[in-house]
Amino acid sequence: MKRKVLSVMLASAMLATMFAGCGNGNAGNTSGTANAGNKTEEAAKTEEAAKTTEASDAEKTADSASGSGSVYYLNFKPEQDQAWQDLAGIYTEQTGVPVTVITAADGTYEQTLKSEMAKSEAPTLFQVNGPVGLANWKDYCYDLSDSEICKQLSSEDFALKNDAGEVSGVAYVLETYGIIYNKKILNDYCTMDNAVISSPDEINSFDKLKAVADDIQARKDEINSQFGYDLQGAFTSAGMDGSSDWRFKTHLANLPIYYEYKDKGITSTDAIEGTYLDNYKQIWDLYITDSTCEPGVLSSKTGDEAESEFGMEEAVFYQNGTWEYGNLTNEDNGYLVTADDMGMMPIYIGAPGEENQGLCTGSENYWCVNKQASEEDIQATLDFLSWVINSDEGRDSMAHAMGFTTPFLTFTGDYVADNVFIQDANQYIADGKTPVSWNFS
């Protein structure tokens, strides 16, 4: 009920501002985590003890893996498809256990999962996004309470439990999203005559963000001439294609929900009142007005186009998350932006006290093991997951190739992701800013 009511309200808000902005002269030329909770002292001790057993656990997993079972992982994240394919190949080479990884296309995971689960060889490993997803797939979720991946969680908060208290899912990645920005372009802008800020650090509210974006949009030709960029707009295109619209229909929509929950001191409700709907509308309006494209073409704009616009330095601001780091820094994509050029700031919507707001941090990625699979395949899947979080190969892949921040105690030292967005999230927390919880899953 909550999601349906919100969907109708926000869809109306989006359409209203898109049509209103179609003739707006501001549009550009037409041309993709930090652990918010601190570890308890007990968890810290457990982490220290875990360091001494990681290697042996990985060896035991490889030694005990049975050749009679197999693993079929239906992966949710297209960005990490190749890394999972590579990791599956390494595991099969070491153990002889077949591991198949199939990745659903952007925005199609639920329908793909339904289709695959109806087959005789269904996924043995899949994911749900949280309580809402669990409600749909609870009859397929094996109890992970005694599994290695559950035992290695740094906090019970990352275990997704059913009504009976069984662990039906385990979070495997903590993610953060906000407004990714190009430090180089923004810093260059700050040196211009009559720039509205002298440092990116001054952006700590919607009003300040809007003032900067409006000025960049109005002066993009001047910026290009002075610094040699090919800037097309302040923000990347806010595409409403299925590969992109989730950024606004769920992630952006989380902000008004978060502030309404915060005001009421609640964590869930059957239906929101829409207290911050106007705030949602104004940030959305800013996205589509100070953009690389006219509002009238947004329906066909894709996530890949937005990613490319940011990567090729055609835009300064790009709403997305930590998962996008790998794509933006992948040399094969030929992007101009580098890791050193990028930062992430909070999404400001004009809510009271937002100057103390951090980035949006949480998880909608929970591993679930299909309890309707054979016993051999269930055990093979549990062994594979144990190897992933304990072995050098698995941890290196998740931390570096995939760029994940994980909730597992085994990811320390060299296995902490070198992701600048995660570093920014940690810095906001260190500075006393409050992370925004995820309330849409």
Identify the role of each PLM range.
Residues 361, 401-411, 421-441:
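C-terminal capping/gating helix-and-loop segments adjacent to ligand/active sites or protein-protein/ligand interfaces
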Residues 60-63, 129-180, 184-187, 225-230, ...:
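Hinge/lid segment of periplasmic solute-binding proteins
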Residues 210-214, 264-300:
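Glycine-centered hinge/linker elements that transmit conformational signals in sensory
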Residues 90-156, 168-169, 184-198, 316-317, ...:
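Extracytoplasmic "Venus flytrap"/periplasmic binding protein-like
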Residues 67-78, 97-102, 125:
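Short, well-ordered beta-strand elements
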Residues 60, 166-172, 177, 207-268:
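Extracytoplasmic/periplasmic solute-binding protein
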Residues 94, 98, 119, 333-402:
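Extracytoplasmic/periplasmic substrate-recognition and gating elements
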